[in-house]
Amino acid sequence: DSIRNSIDNYGADIQKLITSKINTNDTWARDHAFITLLKEDATPLLLDFCFNGWGMKFAANYDNQINNELYFHHPVLKGEYVFCRNFILEGGSIESDGKGSLLTTEQCLLAKNRNEMNRQEVEDFLKETFNLKQVLWLKHGYLAGDDTDSHVDTLARFCPDDTIVYVKCTNEKDEHYKELAMMEEELKAFRTLNGRPYRLLPLPMASAVYDEEHHRLPATYANFLIMNEAVLYPTYADFVNDMRAKEVLAEAFPGREIVGIDCTALIKQHGSLHCVTMQYPEGVY
């Protein structure tokens, strides 16, 4: 009731809210939730991968069962269940343009604490599972304080019209400068399925945010959420960079409303807006 009252106070439509009481380990739905594909007849396919707490760094015994609970015991999701639990995969570790290209990082998907497979084996699995034509691998790029082994949703994201937005560090004294500069060069070398370079739009590096023990946190503007008519993006009480990020996203998503969401509380848990959400296409609810 307290959740419903809080949401109602913000003017949201309570009739569109579905609640289920399920045990969880953490808050990061992006990494354990179903990944959805659509069949040619628009039937949703709900792909259920194994989640192991980002390489067994944290407990995941409850989170790893949430999909099962939502589909079989709290039947609020519709579509065809697809068993993929023989492969460890987090939603934040992959980025698809919906046209046959997928962007990911070697540091995460080739980590020995995920799957005991080499790069070609992982790529073949991804292509078959997601009906892909190419997988674009990033070897460089990281954020201090990141527990995920460099999830791509913190570094670089696909946008409409063969555009990629990515985190760029301009401060040569910042610890991220070299790695993000090398990532930028990799992005410049990538090609679309038509053989053309991607249109690249740099997002500002968020000003450093620290926890109580003065450890740097992985604040990033790449962790935005795409919706039908809007893009929600994280802000960090940093007016100049928050506004610059909004300008870049407005250029990348013409016609969509760009809405900032204060993520100063979320980032203290080492994640942000995209990490804590998972979108589903029409027909799943």
PLM segments and residue spans:
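The feature marks the mature, well-folded catalytic cores of soluble enzymes
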Residues: 1-285
